[in-house]
Amino acid sequence: MIDLCILGTTGGMPMVNKYLSATLININGRKILIDCGEGTQVAMREIGWGFKSIDLICITHSHGDHTIGLPGLLSTMGNSGRTEKVIIVGPKGIKEIVNGLNIINPYLPYELEVVELENNDLKFIIDKNNMFLCEDNDKCNLILSSLEVEHSAKCLSYSFYIKRRPRFSVEKASKNNVPKLLWSKLQNQEIVNYDNKIYTPDLVLDNARKGIKISYVTDTRPISTLPQFIKYSDLFICEGTYGSDEDIDKAIKNKHMTFRESATLAKKGECNELILTHFSAALSAPENFLNNAKEIFHNSIVAHDGLIKTLKFID
């Protein structure tokens, strides 16, 4: 089970009643934060999910409404008892930005690793204590994909595929004469050398089960590579900077999207559900324009600050 919270829904500048666009993903207690504008940690405090267990921070691009909250958040994480490494990923140039913002935090009690991405994947192992980079596709349980999109600064969209461990099969283990004392290690997908024989996980595990895919797209035009990137997403979170179709010229000029354009992406990508977010500060009632999205992709909703969504694995 995966919990997700839309921490803030506005773009450009924080408002009195709306935080800047950011999202927090909770996978069995380990957390991923997407973007960190001014006020993001206040929004996090309101939902009460804590700071210590944020292992991965994904920054879409360098604009201040997506980054200015970083130094304060990193400091709060340290004050909350964080000692394990924290990984920050983002587009090329993010290292310089993080280093600059973090000048006021010279003594963080944990290591900070910054990774610059260019249309590539990262694999992670998530355990009960942290999230680790991993090279082994069989051992990892999270795949993070990135795609460079079209904005006024280098900007990335992200896709998160949370893998699901195959079921353990007693019948298969018995049929393959696997000693019971090896079952636990093989279930954890370890390869075991026992009694001069190699035992592999496929001897005790059924076929892989479908995982959960979450795609996050903001600050971009609807470029041609996006439908394939978000393909079959269980949840597609997408910017809807402009609700009205009449604002299409603004969307093109400022390299953003209208609700209808976001919904068209969701339809082309055959997504299960669309959540619209990152609204223009001038868009005071985005729900009034929801039908512009629903006409194209029915399973569309307008996010509000603090919206929590639970995603369950399907057998």
From Swiss-Prot:
Active-site annotation: 65 (proton acceptor)
Keyword entries, A-Z: Endonuclease, Hydrolase, Metal-binding, Nuclease, tRNA processing, Zinc
An annotated Gene Ontology molecular function: zinc ion binding
UniProt-annotated binding residues for Zn(2+) 2: 65-66, 219, 278
Cofactor note: Binds 2 Zn(2+) ions.
Family listed: Belongs to the RNase Z family.
Subunit structure: Homodimer.
Function (record text): Zinc phosphodiesterase, which displays some tRNA 3'-processing endonuclease activity. Probably involved in tRNA maturation, by removing a 3'-trailer from precursor tRNA.
Name assigned to this protein: Ribonuclease Z
Species this chain originates from: Clostridium botulinum (strain Alaska E43 / Type E3)
